[in-house]
Amino acid sequence: MALAMLVLVVSPWSAARGVLRNYWERLLRKLPQSRPGFPSPPWGPALAVQGPAMFTEPANDTSGSKENSSLLDSIFWMAAPKNRRTIEVNRCRRRNPQKLIKVKNNIDVCPECGHLKQKHVLCAYCYEKVCKETAEIRRQIGKQEGGPFKAPTIETVVLYTGETPSEQDQGKRIIERDRKRPSWFTQN
């Protein structure tokens, strides 16, 4: 049979004592259960401890509470700030040039509607107009089809008032709108 051996190195840090004591108690509870069905050896685990003998004894809780302090209890107090930041440090941190809002130099005027927009980006006002017109066309198509899954597999052409279908539009589905064609909606 193999002899179990545990080596503990004790630090002068007071929170480490509680942590080591908890691990030692847990180890003592788990050892008899570690090999069910096999007789336990007549000897216990060998322990090498550098420090006072109080670490090898289980902690007797006099308050009646059975809660053991865990490793997290000793870590949470370490994460708390120990000193207050000075006002100079706070101002430097808050007014850091990397954190300030950058000035945009790529603002342009939309040539269609005159609203402000970013360069190389579609104008939000014009995009909203296109979305509304597209939604109206889709609503009209839905009324003609009578259902969402009854669309024919042919190409669709949108005609506005005063427009007639061309020779290229023969055999295509034609949607007629009761208004003038918008300037931004090309016929092709």
From Swiss-Prot:
Post-translational modification: MRPL32 precursor is processed by the m-AAA protease (composed of AFG3L2 and SPG7), which cleaves the N-terminal transit peptide. Cleavage by the m-AAA protease takes place prior to assembly into the large subunit, an essential step for mitochondrial ribosome (mitoribosome) assembly. Proper processing by the m-AAA protease is dependent on the zinc-binding region within the tightly folded C-terminal domain of MRPL32: zinc-dependent folding halts degradation initiated from the N-terminus and triggers the release of mature MRPL32.
Protein name in UniProt: Large ribosomal subunit protein bL32m
Source organism per UniProt: Homo sapiens (Human)
Subunit architecture: Component of the mitochondrial large ribosomal subunit (mt-LSU). Mature mammalian 55S mitochondrial ribosomes consist of a small (28S) and a large (39S) subunit. The 28S small subunit contains a 12S ribosomal RNA (12S mt-rRNA) and 30 different proteins. The 39S large subunit contains a 16S rRNA (16S mt-rRNA), a copy of mitochondrial valine transfer RNA (mt-tRNA(Val)), which plays an integral structural role, and 52 different proteins. bL32m has a zinc binding site.
Keyword line: Mitochondrion, Ribonucleoprotein, Ribosomal protein, Transit peptide
Molecular function via GO: RNA binding; structural constituent of ribosome
GO cellular component: mitochondrial inner membrane; mitochondrial large ribosomal subunit; mitochondrial matrix; mitochondrial ribosome; mitochondrion
Similarity-based family: Belongs to the bacterial ribosomal protein bL32 family.
Binding residues annotated for Zn(2+), in chain numbering: C110, C113, C123, C126
Cellular location(s): Mitochondrion
Location of the region described as Disordered in the Swiss-Prot/TrEMBL record: 164-188
Gene: MRPL32
Annotated Basic and acidic residues bias: 169-181
